[in-house]
Regions:
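Histidine-acidic metal/acid-base catalytic patches
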Residues: 2-40, 47-61, 163, 167-180, ...
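Active-site acidic/histidine proton-transfer and metal-coordination neighborhood
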Residues: 14-19, 52-53, 88-178, 187-189, ...
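Hydrophobic faces of well-ordered beta-strands that scaffold small-molecule active sites
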Residues: 37-42, 66-68, 96-101, 126-128, ...
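Active-site beta-loop-alpha junctions enriched in small/polar residues
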Residues: 44-46, 69-73, 101-104, 131, ...
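Catalytic domains of carbohydrate-active enzymes, especially glycoside hydrolases
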Residues: 54-69, 122
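Glycine-rich, proline-tolerant flexible connector loops at the mouths of alpha/beta enzymes
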Residues: 67-84
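Short amphipathic alpha-helical segments at helix-loop
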Residues: 70, 77, 123, 150-151, ...
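Flexible, glycine- and charge-enriched loops at secondary-structure boundaries
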Residues: 75, 82, 128, 159, ...
């Protein structure tokens, strides 16, 4: 691995999880690639609209890429439906950053179908909630298709609750298997978002920019920066972590399903301001 050996890395994160304070921060070495990725949107944020409308709204709001989910573009979509979607994306100047969250199981044939779909739509990353017995299959598939799998956390009670839960399961697997860090859910799990990025450095392929009012299980989603997410610090850490230029950096806003546009526009402005500030630093 490019950061630390997996074993020493997990030992370090175990100490952090236990509450040990360190004199130096983990994973802050500079990267040779400091280019910030494009800002996209997880289309679940626009689930109240039909796909064609949602993509137009994504463009009008200023996003450059989109992350699909099955409710907006199903894995069993026809070739005609996929072609029409790709044509609209091209006309709007949008690219696909990923698709998910998808489940993987020990059914290797079903797992392959998800990868074949991702290849068809041109998704470089699949965000996922993989069963433990799926990893042998995933190791083979990420090599064959050269498509990343990014494990998504879903907060308290989920098997991938904290960053260390993800690190433990990917330890001995292909480096294309990594993390999609939903920063909102990490807030719900009581974890500091910038610290999560440092811990996942080198295996971080997706980000869901999301904020919550309180660091507890039951809380309310809020506009970026109005809860516990320091967006500028998050973008800084992404740059330091060498987040891939084609990584899935997706704003996700789950509130106000029927009329989310004004709120998403406000979130977008916060994120772009932070990105512009960080990109101007030398």
């Amino acid at each position: 691995m490019s950061f630390q050996t997996r074993r020493s890395f997990l030992q370090t994160t175990s100490l952090i999880a236990a509450g040990v304070a360190f004199g130096t921060r983990v994973g802050l070495a500079s990267t040779t690639d400091s280019t910030l990725p494009k800002l996209g949107i997880q289309l679940y944020s626009l689930r109240g609209y039909k796909r064609e409308e949602a993509l137009q709204h994504a463009k009008d709001l200023g996003f450059e890429q989109v992350e699909f989910y099955s409710g907006m573009l199903a894995i069993n979509s026809s070739d005609e439906e996929i072609a029409a979607t790709k044509k609209q994306l091209e006309s709007l100047g949008l690219t696909i950053s990923g698709h998910g969250v998808n489940r993987f199981t020990k059914d290797a044939a079903e797992n392959r179908r998800t990868f074949e779909f991702a290849k068809k739509i041109g998704a470089p990353c699949i965000s996922a909630d993989p069963d433990l017995d799926s990893f042998d299959s995933l190791d083979e598939l990420v090599k064959e298709f050269d498509i990343r799998v990014a494990i998504h956390n879903h907060g308290p009670g989920h098997r991938y609750n904290k960053a260390i839960d993800v690190l433990r399961v990917i330890e001995n697997h292909d480096e294309r298997i990594g993390a999609c860090a939903d920063l909102g859910h990490y807030i719900r799990s009581g974890q500091n978002a910038p610290e999560v990025i440092r811990l996942l450095k080198g295996r971080l392929y997706g980000i869901h920019l999301k904020d919550f009012a309180e660091m507890k299980d039951k809380t309310k989603g809020v506009i970026l920066g109005k809860g516990h997410l320091n967006v500028e610090e998050v973008i800084t850490e992404l740059q330091l972590a060498g987040f891939p230029a084609n990584g899935a950096l997706s704003l996700e806003y789950e509130e106000n399903e029927k009329n989310p546009l004004a709120d998403i526009r406000e979130c977008f402005a916060v994120a772009k301001t932070a990105m512009n500030t960080v990109s101007k630093r030398k």
